[in-house]
Amino acid sequence: MAITIVSNFTSGRFYPSANPINTTVTSNNSGKCNFRYICDLYVNGTKVFTDKIFPDPNTGYGFFLLSRVLQDYIATLGLSNSFAMFNLGASAAAPSASLSVYCRFGEEYDNTINCDGTVLQYPNLATSTTFFVYEGAFDYEDFPTYNHTNYLMGTASATASKSFLTNSPREVDVTYNDTYYLDFLTMATINSNWRLIVTINGVLFTQFIAPTLTNVRRYRLAVGPLNINKLTGAPIINQEITSYEVYLAHNNIRQSEIFRFNVKDPKTFTTRLGFVGLLGGIEHFTFYHRNQKGFTIDRRTYEKTLGRNISNAWSYTVGDRGTTTYKLNAQEQHRVSTYCSQDMSEWLYEMWLSPDVFTYRRPELQEIRIYDEAGTYTGTPDSRILFWVNDTSNLRAGDFIVVIPEKIEGYVEFIGRFQIVSVVGNIVDVGATYGSYYPPRQLCAYIYKDTNFDILPVTISDNAIEVKQKTSRPVEYSLNYQMAYSKNTIRG
């Protein structure tokens, strides 16, 4: 009895889950009666599957194709509202977006001459190397040149530029209430030696020290303006900031590529979609044109006898219903569009291919006016500074709001987080007085309520993708999607 691994897995290699994960074994008993190779698959140290195959008739080899099996144990780790900078990017237990895998090989056969005996099993005759599988998929033309070390963050003593798990352009537009996430792989323990560095035009702006995290080999950074401002407790990404860059460092040495975010003013009509990209990370894209919303409603009806029997006489009252409606089903649908760059248009097809797409219900950004109640702006210390807010329906006394005022050179007093004292009509009072903030004049500002976001699942209803060719002009993308749940209706 001898099993030989002809084609072993590369020890310590990270394999994308949707691409081939194959191994080949052979045995000197492959000519025996009813011979089959056995592969016991271990995920995170636990046997989860046993595969048995007959030997190849030409070579006698056993070819095990494991990708489809392993995909059953792969799952995206959903977003949380923790707003920590360093987060787990995979669960510790399967199903997970990062798995530790190895195989034990054996064989079974009937050792009698006439092939009429009992088939005996001989498991655990050889063990493969341990390798890792992460949620990801590389295109047919790209996978032959795939090298996992390009994505594996290390602890190098010299500057490195390892890639995050995304195919998106490395320069993206965001606004103040946008979240953004970057996943990465590493074998190293995440602890205080790791830092997320934020720079402005290459100059250090701020940094975030990592806590000690469970070793799951895949991690997620929260690097959007909403994430950073929530974590710091103040809107440090504000109208003074036109762009910022982030990268990952170990012992103050850069280990990752540099990702750049251009901070744009909010637009009137925005629809921000998130989706799981081909490399398993959470991707984002914002459509800026008006969202066209509608409902597709399916209803069933039947005719019932009109009237009622009272004292053996049929009668009805005007208003009685003869046609009765039942089984109402309403599906909310949307159509969105926007212009985008050539690079973005090449990448956007990943949204159409994603099995998991969602839209955000984010803290709403509003443009407001900040004014002196006395109307003088000349130094009445006790004069209240009030906010005029167009829509106060979601604001209550005790709520916290984040204020990002217009850019005035040398004046940054109202950039901050405030607690609402009272809401009267459109007037919001946060307890500010002229003597505390000295506004030079009436100010414009953006505010949003300091609260968590919600994720609403959607399904893309387009079955054909129009591929945009590269041109010298921006290209327009349109998308139809519907909510991945029906509206609740009253039973008829």
Identify the role of each PLM range.
Residues 365-382, 390-400, 404-460:
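Small/polar beta-strand repeat architecture
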Residues 157, 162-165, 169, 340, ...:
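A broadly conserved detector of short glycine/acidic/proline-rich loop/turn motifs that flank catalytic sites
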Residues 2, 181, 185-186, 208-216, ...:
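Extracellular/virion structural assembly segments
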Residues 1-266:
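Preference for solvent-exposed, low-hydrophobicity sequence contexts
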Residues 174-175, 383, 387:
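Phosphate-coordinating catalytic segments in nucleotide- and nucleic-acid-processing enzymes
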Residues 6, 42, 185, 197-201, ...:
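A structural detector for beta-sheet-dominated domains
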Residues 333, 382-385, 425-429, 474-476:
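A generic structural signal for beta-strand entry/edge sites
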Residues 100-108, 348-364, 402-406:
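Short, acidic/charged, Gly/Pro-enriched secondary-structure junctions
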